[in-house]
Amino acid sequence: MKKTKIVCTMGPNTNDKNIMLELAKNGMDVARFNFSHGDYAEHQSRLEILKEVRKELDRPVAALLDTKGPEIRTGVLKDGKKVSLKEGQTFTLTTREIIGDETITHINYSGLNEDVAAGNKILIDDGLIELEVEKVEGTEIVCTVINGGELGEKKGVNVPNVKIKLPALTEKDKEDIRFGIKQGFDFIAASFVRTADCIREIKSMLDSEGSAIKVIAKIENAEGIDNLDEIIAVADGIMVARGDMGVEIPAQEVPHIQKEIIRKCNEACKTVITATQMLDSMIRNPRPTRAEVTDVANAVYDGTDAVMLSGETAMGKYPVDALKMMVSIVEETEAYLDYSAYRRRKVTEENMKNISNAVCAASVATAHDIGADYIIAPSITGFTSMMLSKWRPAARIIGMSPSTTTVRQMMLQWGVTPIWSRRAESTDELIENSLEELKSGNVINSGDLAVITAGIVTYARRHEAAAATNIMRVVSVD
């Protein structure tokens, strides 16, 4: 059974319930809804299918809402036709609302003319077209074409190494987040996060609605990389979004940045997802390239908690085959992981002094030393199982919670099998309930050795949630 989790993107393919069923049966842990495309009716329809699939399979697949984010795009063109840009020609970007042609096009960000200056590079359509700013005249950004090509309508625009003053959250993002709260999403992945303020703003929205949705920050530009530490500190997790990242910064820098992000997330005990083009050729072909297989494996070796499929499952020709291939790569790679090395890993100074982290580290070491089959982690919030997963035990982690939202959110935690449980009022009741439910569900059997770790409050504070993971007990299942 794989330990690394897999995020699958929903799309036209998953309008077919049978395909979504097959994805959920074959290893999809989180369903990603990309709000850069589609309308609410479309997303709600797929979410309803997902809810049906959860019930049919009794598998708590989580739902992740990926925001569109503050994007810069080109405008419409005359007759809707592409225009050809030639190297060396002059081409103008304008914030005025116009119909574009081979000499000029509209840009949807009204402040771009204030952010750029002569010498800045502007990339269009994933970097296929490159412009250099010659001068700025009012609303007009006059450029020279460095790399030409065919320019279509509404293409993405990147401005490397320039601080863009776009709002952290657009009005569309805010409406989408409200929709996500109402519909019961488990995660929000915030696109184009540049500073921690974006995450704080989203969390403020969620808090005001009493929502327990967790927030994943997508790192995909130079400013986000520069502010990585402060973003990790406030986010619940990070997505290494290599698509726009590979346009905003030199492509050859992406591998070491990916490793750095994964390392820092593991030190901080935060979830990390590696995404974009992992098995991209399987959108068209039934087999991946050797380079793609190696890419997935290396992300697992780096210590990622999850890997993600995008177009492969959303609209590719082989959605289920792509998932099965990713599962097989992950399982094969995990067979060669040195689990003992993780017990010597570096953690942040804050976590080094953290009681929960110390108890979880001791639980993993104990499970290894006595050859325990399971580490059982009852938790209201899923915090205990998250801390355990970062120590990468060879033993199976069973996360248990009375919260159905927490159970689904644990689906993104490395190595954690989430199971719903009754709430307990005492330590003995907690342990007895956990073992009873796991035995009745044939998850554990008589003779199994298990380490149980949890956060327990005193009797006087029994109606409060535990503030920390603070107990460990070893049990032999009767």
What are the residue ranges of the model-derived segments?
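Non-catalytic helical/linker scaffolds that mediate oligomerization, partner binding
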Residues: 1-478
